[in-house]
């Protein structure tokens, strides 16, 4: 018996079978890689917290060890907060998220115990345009937050060039990525 490949029923059945096969394969791959993906996401979060708190590490294993030994989670129903002590000073890190141009930006902001000076910032995830909003991952952008004084209870982002003062609570935005910088 010869199959009529020009028949609409054949086309629909063939498309359904191929689609079903690919869905099964992709589901199996997704399930097989899920633990690794979760582990890597947790590692990115740990490294971002350590970076914001200015805790150095040389490897992924060292980062995990330092996080387990030096950083404690602060019990809070509303926010995800961590703390450490460095040079006799307590440093707090807050996980934050907000809207960028293409999706949610999730990061870590570390402040001193008086909440008056930013100790550092790092980003856990972002999906901004490479070369524009994606530049928030670059060290020059993150470094300008370090030791910035919190003015009027908040740090603002200036879209124009600032004078580089750490006392005014302003940092430079990424040129061409105004929405991401906010």
Where are these regions (language model features)?
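Flexible, solvent-exposed loop/hinge segments and secondary-structure transition points
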Residues: 2-182
